Amino acid sequence: MGQYTVSTRKNVRILLVGDAGVGKTSLILSLVSEEYPEEVPPRAEEITIPANVTPEQVPTSIVDFSSVEQTEETLGLEINKAHVVCIVYSVDDDDSLDRITSHWLPLIRSKCNATLEGDAETEAETEAAGEGLRKPIVLVGNKIDLIDYSTMDSVLAIMEDFPEIESCVECSAKTLHNISEMFYYAQKAVLHPTSPLYIMEDQELTPACKKSLVRIFKICDTDGDNLLNDYELNLFQRRCFNTPLQPQILDEVKAVIQKNVPDGIYNDAVTLKGFLFLHCLFIQRGRNETTWAVLRRFGYNDQLEMCQEYLRPPLKIPPGSSTELSHRGQKFLISVFERYDRDCDGALSPEEHKMLFSVCPSSPWSYSTDIRKSCPINDKGWVTLHGWLCRWTLMTLIDVVKTMEYLAYLGFNVHENDSLLAAIHVTRERRIDLAKRQSSRSVYKCHVIGPNGSGKTGLCRGFLVDEMQKLIGKEFKTNVVHCINSVQVYGQEKHLILRDIDVRHALDPLQPQEVNCDVACLVYDSSNPRSFEYVARIYIKYYAESKIPVMIVGTKCDMDERRQDYLMQPAEFCAKYKLLPPHLFSLRTNKKELYTKLATMAAFPHLRHFGLLTEDSKLLWKAGLGLAAATMLGFIVLKTLSAAGSHSR
């Protein structure tokens, strides 16, 4: 799959207006026939120039307007249909030049605003729309063959007062001087407009353009030293223009920057100020297309907003499939982490985390209340590389669109020179896993369900820490819905996501999205005689007839175990429904085998009823070997799961 760049318009529509007799029709006919017409009709018919004969390779329609044959109402319609309007004046007629400001520009503004008023609901919206969406204008001085002076000084003064004027050109329909250039400027005003990039009266970049270029600079600064060295500049050049930067040209560019911006070059590398100056210079010299090529390569549209197609390419996810990070996606995220881990301590401090997402509109999560409490961290409470990848794995499973969006913000498309789809792996459908009796996925979701006070939140948080004793007696004030970490299942790393299902009242029904998962963990407090009844009812109502593996867990097993006030005791209940015996869990005494068992159950979804394990022992043996051929022959699923009784009592 090739690189993705935001596309420009598929066609351009140019409208020519101006006073009678200034030569609008002659300009069109001279362009088409490449000779001056002896007889000129009142108005030329609309013509379309094929893409292969235009400099920008875009089909272009040229429309003539005649006040003799057409009405002002027709003019209004044509103005709104046009992408750019060329106001033609005669260089030997001062009145036609004066009427640019007294008649034509106010008229075009009024026609555009009339359309915007119909779409805007408030006066403020109308004013804002009128300022931001004015029709691009090109001023065309015809009949330059009749004078020996230029009108450019007068025209430049007009341009300062009307920012929608993109460019101006003097030409002659009779001698064909600058005829092609005139229509090229008109195309350019549509495809590579100046106004979104540059404030003419201030001679500087617009805030939106500057913000976009700052983001691009940061993304291209792959070593994070706030400079673009020769390697980074060459990579930037290849990604944007598909060609290397010749050493001589690179030296010349640096010399120009050094001459004009004293601190634009540092240690023979380009600073941010130098980078911004370079693009300002491109625009001042009429090379808008260079800056636009860069912006579009990095996902920006004509309004300097990130294009939705760039952020969210269509991704087909069949029913029963899930989404994971591909190897390339993980590799890219590792490189981003290492770039911003300035002190190389293997973790992101709050400040480093903030700097990392400075190229995004905002962070995808809260550092203090989300990522630090949903994935592994170090002793300082900072997110480790492992935790960083875990959090992205979590987001990719539950909100893959958001993952793609933030990968785009961070520059995946450019660094990997590919579509965002290359960062995502869509797993096969779950029904196929069941049919093949083995799952090839590496990320599983476990719903932890139980009554309030059962200890399910502590069970989830215990998955993130090496020493669970640290959590004893701790109040969990922040309600973190998901916790994610990795476990080894037959020598392969699997990510397990624990979702803490918040149940306010015992009689509240569970929603389908709260029930459906890869494995369910039903939690009761073994020291509370009324706790198991809720778990039993949940199982019978939602899971008894489903294909979802279920493990029943009794927490707080370090306390006195109480007989449950239910028809059956937990062990009897599990035996009746052919489930593994209850796994007794305690933050004080338990190790982490519970999480490995849950992941293993998710990896082998066909073994839902573990009372049938003896019948499936040969199959289980093969499945274990198929999941990880390098695993010792004695390690099979049966050993992992059936040992629940010995480990949990």
Swiss-Prot record:
Ca(2+) 2 binds at residues 341, 343, 345, 352. Residues 644-649 are mitochondrial intermembrane. Its main location: mitochondrion. Residues 9-192, 441-604 form the Miro domain. The chain crosses the membrane at residues 623-643. Ca(2+) 1 binds at residues 221, 223, 225, 232. GO terms for molecular function: calcium ion binding; GTP binding; GTPase activity. GTP 2 binds at residues 450-457, 488-492, 555-558. Its EC number is 3.6.5.-. GO terms for cellular component: mitochondrial outer membrane. Residues 1-622 are cytoplasmic. Residues 208-243, 328-363 form the EF-hand domain. One of its GO terms (biological process) is mitochondrion transport along microtubule. It is a single-pass type IV membrane protein. Belongs to the mitochondrial Rho GTPase family. This is Mitochondrial Rho GTPase. It comes from Drosophila pseudoobscura pseudoobscura. The gene is Miro.
